[in-house]
Amino acid sequence: MLRYGFLAAMAVLVATPVMAQAPACTPAVADSELVKSRTLVMSTNPTLPPLQFVDAQGQLRGMRVELGNEIARRLCLTPEYIRIEFSAMIPGLAARRWDLINTGIFYTEERARMMQMVRYENQAISFSAPRGNPQNIRTTDDLAGKTVGVELGGFEERRTRELSQSLQAKGLQPMNIRTFDNFAVAYQALRAGQVQAVTSIDGVAAEYDQRGDFPRVLNGLFPTPVSFATRSRVLADAVVGALEAMKADGSLKALFDRYGASIYTDKLDVVGPQ
């Protein structure tokens, strides 16, 4: 398995234009809906191999990066990425620093009241342990009293805290939850023995397991679709159109199959404030 190099921490914004010039066609989204003329500016937290990561040459890679590039191409826009921690993404979207959150943001009704969301992928929560699973974590009850690392501010943190509360309700010890700026730092803490498990998503935990780094000891928890998120209803509708076209010509399935990901099976649509 190829070992991917990726950023351990990203405190500074890094803009990555993927193409030097805009495509020679008519953009499907007006400049008035965009942060930058003829450009689809997307935020990503590239610490989630194989879905989004930075390779040894410093280039953005992964399924969601490829998907964002293809959507931009079909909308006749130049893709550009800003690498940023997840906790800054929703405020940055509101401040018009980027057009689209392309980081696999989990769909929730609360978020859909703030942003236009397009569900496109099914994901779930996993827990990873150190090699050999020394704490013998086999069920969620085995997480009682354990020190667990998770990325700050996301769905994963929320679900980890809910699970900890459910353990307490059963008379078990709560988890000692430690938050980190991103998943890469959380996994580094696991490697260093600072935490006893890490919460992530199925695709990422499976990747670390396949590499032989950290066994995926629990998976498939809290299955929930992940989404694109944007301020603009017009842009969201255009993204749905691009996804529908990819679904119709088979390219969406081919991309997801290549990465072992699961396509959202319900209707592709926009959920958000009118």
Write out the residue ranges for each language-model feature.
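Acidic, polar ligand-binding/catalytic clefts
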Residues: 69, 73, 78-142, 213, ...
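Extracytoplasmic small-molecule ligand-binding "clamshell" domains
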Residues: 22-104, 249, 258
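A ligand-binding cleft/hinge motif common to bilobed small-molecule-binding domains
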Residues: 88-91, 104-113, 159-166, 188-222
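Short helix-initiation/N-cap motifs at beta->coil->alpha
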Residues: 65, 81-91, 135, 174-188
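Alpha-to-beta junction loops
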Residues: 41, 77-78, 95-103, 146-147, ...
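Ligand-binding cleft/hinge of the Venus flytrap
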Residues: 68-75, 156-179, 209-210
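Extended ligand-binding regions for polar small-molecule ligands
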Residues: 22-24, 65-74, 133-134, 141-155, ...
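Periplasmic-binding protein-like
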Residues: 46, 122-129, 202-244, 262-274
